[in-house]
Amino acid sequence: MGVWHGRSLRKPTGGRIRPHRKKRKFEMGNPPTETLVGEERKLKERRGMGGNVKKGLKFATHANVADPETGEVKCVRIEEVVKNPASQYYERHGVITKGAIIRTEIGLAKVTNRPGQEPVVNAVLIKEEEEEG
């Protein structure tokens, strides 16, 4: 079944609202692109308004991790998702979202962008104590 972002056909009281027009294509939605840690990087393309193509990351292998102390940004391999405050389900299944804490080759990092909406994973290096507290 498709995702539809149009107005509900029911009033708060439960009564029916008679639609004045049919559903339109621009009211359509998409299920979320749940970015996972994978063996090979894979993108998911969606059609946007005006024929625009939106690219989201389906499987991620590497992340651009910034070190706030030195200011350096390194492209490092993602090992696993340690914590995801967005959802227990996402944490259990290893889904990467904004705010998720991932383990990389150089340490723990917090994701700062939305990989389901952008084709990269950007993160900031955090100390081990910050994650536990």
From Swiss-Prot:
Keyword Ribosomal protein attached: yes
UniProt-annotated stretches for the region Disordered: 1-34
Pfam families referenced in this protein's UniProt entry, alphabetically: Ribosomal_S8e
Entry's Gene Ontology molecular function annotations: structural constituent of ribosome
Keyword terms of this UniProt record: Ribonucleoprotein, Ribosomal protein
GO CC term, one of those recorded: ribosome
InterPro entries: Ribosomal_eS8, Ribosomal_eS8_CS, Ribosomal_protein_eS8_arc, Ribosomal_Se8/biogenesis_NSA2
GO biological process, one term: translation
Family: Belongs to the eukaryotic ribosomal protein eS8 family.
Subunit organization: Part of the 30S ribosomal subunit.
Protein name: Small ribosomal subunit protein eS8
